[in-house]
Amino acid sequence: HEDPRRQRQMCIRDRPSKVEAVKSAISSVGVSGATILDARGFGSTKGHTDSYRGAQYQVDTNPKAMLQVACKDESVNDIIEAVRSVANTNTIGDGKIFITELLDVIRIRTGETGEGAINGEY
């Protein structure tokens, strides 16, 4: 059951090569801003072999991109579908979407809270 007063934070973790496509996809369903972070992670992909000055070595983490989005509860499903439409390759490493309840948002400059602090001018 969707509650229009509830806010969510979505953390979208995927390959760095998918950032622009994901950013465009979430913008198309009304997301007006996101925080994008470079990260490293490990899981099913188990890292990779790299070389430095001719020497091979094992890297046990992979580069990831994280997009953090604050949104209304009612927008979550649209955002999930938008992300999956551009990021799903049906292979290991496609990433994950984490969704948590967001208790509040406060715009530092104005003191505005809630949905008004998520949307609009920065």
Label the model's feature ranges.
Residues 1-8:
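Single conserved hydrophobic/aromatic residue that forms the stacking wall/gate
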Residues 9-49:
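N-terminal first-folded block
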Residues 9-12, 33-35, 65-68, 95-98:
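Structural motif
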